[in-house]
């Protein structure tokens, strides 16, 4: 099971899960020793198979750091915080966390897009 480390020390994932707003992006960074990267990838793949079946799931993309890095970044889009909360607390998903390498750390955090005039739309 990964050790969870808050990405933002002032706003925890538990705080974010209380939000009732719509459309969110989950950013989750995982870190393992490079030698355990394949084990992390296998565990994440099994989790992603569960998550993509959940109501409100839109899409996901996994990224890996370059040059042999053991750092991964998952970017997942959900219709709402409620949909993500239901998926994250799903017993089937929670049971799969034990499949991650013991050395793994995970830092999940929820985001919303920000409009910056002339640069990007929300």
Language model segments and positions:
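A broadly tuned preference for mixed-charge, low-complexity surface segments
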Residues: 78-95, 114-122
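N-terminal first-folded block
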Residues: 13-15, 20-43
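General detector of folded, globular domains
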Residues: 29, 48, 109-113
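Glycine-rich beta-strand-turn "strand-cap" elements at beta-sheet edges
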Residues: 1-24, 61-71, 96-122
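Short amphipathic alpha-helical segments
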Residues: 36-59, 92-96
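Short, well-ordered beta-strand segments in beta-rich or mixed alpha/beta enzyme
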Residues: 23-31, 61-90
């Amino acid at each position: 099971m990964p050790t969870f480390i808050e990405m933002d020390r002032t706003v925890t994932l538990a705080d974010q899960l209380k939000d009732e707003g719509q459309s969110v992006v989950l950013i989750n960074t995982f870190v393992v020793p490079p030698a355990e990267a394949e084990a992390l990838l296998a565990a994440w793949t099994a989790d992603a198979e569960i998550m993509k079946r959940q109501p409100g799931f839109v899409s996901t993309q996994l990224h890996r750091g370059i040059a042999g890095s053991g750092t991964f970044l998952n970017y997942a889009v959900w219709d709402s915080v409620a949909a993500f909360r239901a998926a994250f607390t799903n017993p089937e998903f929670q049971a799969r966390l034990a499949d991650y390498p013991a050395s793994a750390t995970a830092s999940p955090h929820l985001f919303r897009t920000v409009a910056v005039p002339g640069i990007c739309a929300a």
